[in-house]
Structures are given as C-alpha cells and as structure tokens.
Amino acid sequence: MGQKINPLGFRLGTTQGHHSLWFSQPKNYSEGLQEDKKIRDCIKNYVQKNMRTSSGIEGIARIEIQKRIDLIQVIIFMGFPKLLIESRPRGIEELQMTLQKEFNCVNRKLNIAVTRIAKPYGNPNILAEFIAGQLKNRVSFRKAMKKAIELTEQADTKGIQIQIAGRIDGKEIARVEWIREGRVPLQTIRAKIDYCSYTVRTIYGILGIKIWIFLDEE
C-alpha cells in the first residue's frame, strides 16, 4: 500500500506557506498553538451562526494568524464575504469584540481583516462544504461529486480528486468512493496542490470527504 502523506505538510516551504506566523519560547509553544485553535474555532462558530446562506456554505477558505508582542493579526480568507457583511453589517467589529473578551487581550491588540478569494470554487474547503450540504440533503453522492467537478472547471484548475468514505447512501457496509478529473500529481513537490479533509454528519453516520486540487506547476 502506498503511504499517503498530507500534501500540504509535504510541500511546506516550497509551494505551501504556513497558516500561523509567530515565534515563541519552547515552554509557551503549546499555549500559542491552543490559542490559535480556539481563535479559528471561535471564528468558524461565529460565521456559522450569523451567515444566512441557503446552501449552508460558510465559505471560509483559511484563517491566517500573525502574532507580534503587542498585536494579533487575523486574516480570514473567504469565498463569499458579502453574505456575512450583508447579514451583519457590523459583523467584523462584533467578532473582534467576542474574540477580545474570550482571550482577554489586555496588553495585545487584536485585529481582524476579511479578504475575498478570487475563485471560491477552486478552494477545497469551500467545495467540501458544498458536497457536505448536498449529502445532508440526501442528494446522490455521484451527482454531488460531478456537480463539484463542474464548479471547479469554472475556476481554471488543472485537476481534482474527490474521495468520500463511510456509509454512503445509508448502505450497511462502509466503503470508499472516489473520482478524478484531470491530473493530480501528488508525488511532484513543485506541483501546487491544495488539500482538505472534512467530516460531515448525516443521519446514517459520519462521512469523510477528502479533496485534492491541482492548481498550478511552478
């Protein structure tokens, strides 16, 4: 069996950058890591509660955190920031206040910026949310996969692979189904590949969705 490494960690420092940029003393490192996790969870929960979308897509591609001695800079990359801003005009300020209360930033300023990504459906996280929404609405998994591939074709990607594992369509025996369109060279380090794994709770149990998108070759 081929051992499958996480494509993002495999390419760190070449085509993939870090999502958290900060340094700390070894003894404080675990605290910083937990703080990052809490910040990301808090933002995701807030967006989930306050974003009114029919499709159920939150549209968060990634959250980057940069820390300095007196400042925590959080950049949220979203596919559809308009929806959040329209449903809550002061949403960003509210989110900032919530985070400041949560982490009692007395001596550190917290700053949040929202950036729109150009091609939302070229991002695996947003696609995974789309597929999850379809599966929750009991759309057949093949139909959901094909629709997702159609959406990525509009985003000028060079290849995509989608894998769904679990009790698909409520069958008694769990299985793995996958589909690939175009090229996905996982062994090539200079190939810019975006990856995401996402769990979705359906009435039959939990399904795992994995998406690899081949964006470009450097």
From Swiss-Prot:
GO molecular function, one term: structural constituent of ribosome
PROSITE patterns membership: KH_TYPE_2, RIBOSOMAL_S3
GO cellular component: chloroplast; cytosolic small ribosomal subunit
A Pfam family matched in the record: Ribosomal_S3_C
Annotated keywords: Chloroplast, Plastid, Ribonucleoprotein, Ribosomal protein, RNA-binding, rRNA-binding
Quaternary organization: Part of the 30S ribosomal subunit.
Protein name per its UniProtKB record: Small ribosomal subunit protein uS3c
Source species taxonomy: Eukaryota, Viridiplantae, Streptophyta, Embryophyta, Tracheophyta
Encoding gene per record: rps3
